């Protein structure tokens, strides 16, 4: 069977957030770990990594899903979106560290093209790290707030968006935006499941609307936790974060009493459905 066939057996796990560090040995180790876990991963690939990853994806499409890590402020961003699409990548991102707020009109043509191509998008939301504090940088976490996605989600209803880090620390806003925007999903990678480990029950207050019947909440929604998709945010080749993230997610879902069907959706089912729908709409191709 063609490994890119959207009708193939779904993997148990889909990690929507793995950064490539440029090292082909990392790719080999990642593939081995994913296959052992019956998992797939969305591999965030920068333009300089394009040729290397494109070749690798062709050989390992059973466990790797390409995401083009395009810079929103790159003058050549639209061309890179086309190149990633033509090469069989299924998504874009992680969009981050932009010179303007995410919802600035200058980025509209990029989001419009992504929606036309049905490319899944991953946005960094919330606080952003500062690895070199002595180096000046035009970066502001305020431009990356999860609330900046609201206008994008409404303007481009066909654009599937994953908000990485669930807006850390704006969790209430992130959950409420996901409640009203069917094209928004949330990932809990990063520090969130570390700092909340003493009482994961707090997530029940964020995802409060399961089974609620009210004119003040959308009708027909499944378990509110179904807005989550699994993510590890592996970067700098730190593959151990995959297993640590799995354990944190499973523990949180257990503490919150999330049912088995919803857990399966979070850990892989939802992401695989989105990818399969995207491929089916493209005639079985990326």
Where are these regions (language model features)?
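Acidic (Asp/Glu)-rich catalytic clusters
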Residues: 5-9, 29-36, 51-65, 79-88, ...
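Mid-to-C-terminal alpha-helical segments outside catalytic/metal-binding sites
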Residues: 1-17, 25-40, 51, 82, ...
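Histidine/acidic-residue-rich catalytic or RNA/ligand-binding cores of hydrolases
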Residues: 24-28, 53, 131-135, 171-180, ...
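Conserved, mostly hydrophobic/aromatic
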Residues: 17, 34, 84, 92, ...
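His/Asp/Glu-enriched short active-site or ligand-binding loop at hydrolase and phosphoryl-transfer sites
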Residues: 185-199
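Charged helix-capping and loop-helix junction motifs
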Residues: 103-112, 138-147, 200-213, 245
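Hydrophobic faces of well-ordered beta-strands that scaffold small-molecule active sites
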Residues: 14-18, 41-43, 65-68, 92-94, ...
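Active-site gating/metal-coordination segments in enzymes
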Residues: 48-143, 192-193
């Amino acid at each position: 069977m063609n490994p890119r066939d959207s009708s193939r057996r779904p993997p148990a796990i889909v990690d929507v957030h793995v950064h490539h560090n440029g090292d082909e040995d990392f790719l080999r180790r990642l593939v081995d770990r994913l296959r052992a876990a019956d998992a797939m991963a969305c591999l965030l690939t920068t333009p300089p990594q394009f040729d290397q990853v494109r070749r690798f994806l062709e050989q390992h499409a059973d466990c790797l899903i390409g995401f083009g890590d395009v810079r929103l402020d790159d003058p050549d961003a639209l061309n890179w979106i086309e190149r990633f699409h033509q090469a069989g990548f299924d998504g874009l991102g992680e969009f981050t560290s932009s010179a303007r707020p995410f919802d600035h009109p200058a980025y509209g043509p990029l989001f419009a093209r992504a929606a036309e191509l049905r490319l899944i998008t991953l946005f960094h939301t919330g606080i952003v790290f500062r690895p070199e504090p002595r180096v000046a940088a035009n970066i502001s976490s305020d431009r990356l707030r999860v609330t900046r996605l609201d206008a994008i989600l409404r303007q481009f209803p066909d654009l599937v968006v994953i908000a990485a880090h669930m807006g850390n620390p704006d969790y209430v806003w992130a959950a409420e935006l996901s409640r009203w925007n069917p094209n928004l999903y949330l990932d809990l990678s990063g520090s969130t499941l570390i700092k909340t480990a003493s009482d994961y029950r707090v997530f029940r207050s964020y995802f409060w609307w399961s089974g609620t019947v009210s004119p003040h909440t959308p009708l027909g929604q499944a378990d509110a936790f179904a807005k989550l998709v699994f993510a590890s945010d592996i970067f700098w080749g730190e593959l151990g974060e995959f297993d640590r993230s799995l354990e944190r997610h499973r523990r949180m879902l257990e503490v919150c009493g999330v049912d088995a069907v919803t857990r399966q959706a979070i850990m892989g089912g939802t992401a695989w459905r989105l990818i399969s729908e995207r491929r089916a709409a493209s005639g079985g191709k990326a």
